[in-house]
Regions:
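Cytoplasmic helix-loop-helix junction between adjacent transmembrane helices
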Residues: 91-131
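Helix-loop-helix hairpin linking two adjacent transmembrane segments in secondary transporters
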Residues: 126-173
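C-terminal ends and interior cores of transmembrane alpha-helices
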Residues: 68-82
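Helix-loop junctions at membrane interfaces in 12-TM secondary transporters
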Residues: 79-91
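Central cavity-lining transmembrane alpha-helices of secondary-active solute carriers
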Residues: 37-52
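Extracytoplasmic
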Residues: 2-29
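Membrane-interface helix termini in secondary transporters
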Residues: 20, 51-52, 56, 143
Length: 174
C-alpha cells in the first residue's frame, strides 16, 4: 500500500503545482498538456516490460527499483523545469517508466506470496494506496507550496520514495 501511496503522491503533485509552474515559466495549456501526457508515454511502455522483468527477476527487485527510479525523477522535476521545457518532458517520461512497472511487479508478488483465496483482499488493500495517496497529495501539496515553494512538493515526495526503497530493499525478501 505504501508504494502505491507514494506512486500517487508523486503522480498527482504536478497537477496541483501546475498553475504555479505554468505561470512561472509562461507555458500555455498545450505545453502543460504535453507535460502531463509525457508521464503516461513512459508509463504505458513499461506496463508490459514490468511484467516480464518481474517474472524474470522477481517482483521485489523490480518494484523496489521502479520506486527508486520514479522517486529520483520526481526529485529532478524542479531542476528539469528550470532548465527547459524539453528537459522536463524527458524527466516526466523517465518518471513514467519507473511508475509503469509498479502494478505488474505487485501482481507478480501476489502470485508468489499471497495464497489464491486471499489475493482479492490483498489487491484491495494495496489499491487503497491510490485514493489515500491522491487525497494526501491534494491536501499536502498546496500546504508545502505555500510554506516552501512548489519545488519542495517534488523534493519531499520524491525523498519519501527513496526512504521507502531503503527499507524495502533492506528488509523484504523475495
Amino acid at each position: 500500500t505504501l508504494a502505491v501511496f507514494i506512486c500517487y503522491i508523486d503522480r498527482i503533485n504536478i497537477s496541483v503545482a501546475a498553475v504555479e509552474i505554468q505561470d512561472q515559466f509562461g507555458w500555455d495549456n498545450t505545453q502543460l498538456g504535453l507535460v502531463f501526457s509525457s508521464f503516461f508515454a513512459g508509463y504505458i511502455f513499461t506496463q508490459y516490460l514490468g511484467g516480464f522483468l518481474a517474472d524474470r527477476y522477481g517482483g521485489k527487485s523490480v518494484l523496489g527499483y521502479g520506486v527508486l527510479l520514479w522517486s529520483f525523477f520526481t526529485i529532478l522535476t524542479p531542476a528539469a523545469a528550470h532548465h527547459s521545457f524539453f528537459f522536463l518532458i524527458i524527466v516526466r517520461v523517465l518518471m513514467g517508466l519507473g511508475e509503469g512497472i509498479t502494478f505488474p511487479a505487485w501482481h507478480s508478488l501476489y502470485a508468489r506470496w499471497i495464497p489464491y483465496q486471499e489475493r482479492t483482499r490483498a489487491i484491495a488493500f494495496t489499491n487503497s494506496g491510490i485514493p489515500l495517496g491522491s487525497i494526501f497529495a491534494y491536501v499536502m501539496t498546496p500546504i508545502i507550496m505555500i510554506m516552501f515553494g512548489w519545488e519542495w512538493a517534488f523534493y519531499s515526495f520524491g525523498a519519501l520514495g527513496l526512504v521507502w526503497f531503503f527499507f524495502w530493499h533492506r528488509n523484504i525478501t523475495s
